[in-house]
Regions:
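Long, contiguous binding/interaction regions
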Residues: 1-174
């Protein structure tokens, strides 16, 4: 994909061997970006958590990463964005999460990744995709609004908004 500023990024499914690139990408994130995504501060992405995040069950999970195009003979470039979704136990809904490093934010990458995860959920014939967003995460709330998500309070979580997109009427062309 080509960003609004002309930079090219490689988008692909996450792989188990992405754990180290995921950790390198985590170091690009600002503390506030981490808090807004994980809903609590984290100083580092531990090797164990990186392994867990980079290993998915494709029967119920979906995850894409964005990185600069790989250079032959060089280590994998750091991952600068991740979107993931997991089908819930009811098999009718999926919960999504997304993070985009600040040097790549506001350039269409988040919208592109969200459209991809919505298409995956539609392909899986799910009824809804949803995510929990801190009410101060105005960028994510604005993106969700622009894609047709509805807002509700997350059950039992003060300061958290649940954004939901019913998929039978979803439009990913906005």
């Amino acid at each position: 994909m080509v960003l609004a500023d002309g930079r090219a990024l490689h988008i692909r499914p996450i792989r188990a061997d992405d754990a180290e690139a995921l950790r390198r990408g985590f170091s690009l994130l600002e503390p506030e970006e981490i808090r807004l995504r994980f809903m609590h501060p984290m100083r580092e992405l531990t090797p164990e958590l990186a392994r867990r995040l980079s290993t998915i069950d494709t029967r119920s999970d979906f995850a894409l990463i964005a990185c600069e195009p790989p250079t032959h003979g060089q280590p994998s470039p750091p991952i600068v964005a991740v979107v993931r979704a997991s089908i819930q136990t009811d098999r009718r809904r999926a919960e999504y999460a997304i993070i985009v490093a600040h040097p790549f934010a506001g350039l269409g990458l988040g919208r592109h990744l969200m459209r991809r995860v919505i298409r995956w959920a539609q392909y899986r014939r799910l009824d809804e995709i949803f995510g929990d967003v801190l009410d101060e995460n105005t960028a994510m709330l604005a993106l969700a609004d622009s894609l047709g998500f509805r807002r509700d309070r997350a059950p039992g979580e003060p300061g958290v908004i649940r954004v939901r997109l019913p998929l039978k009427r979803a439009s990913t062309t906005r």
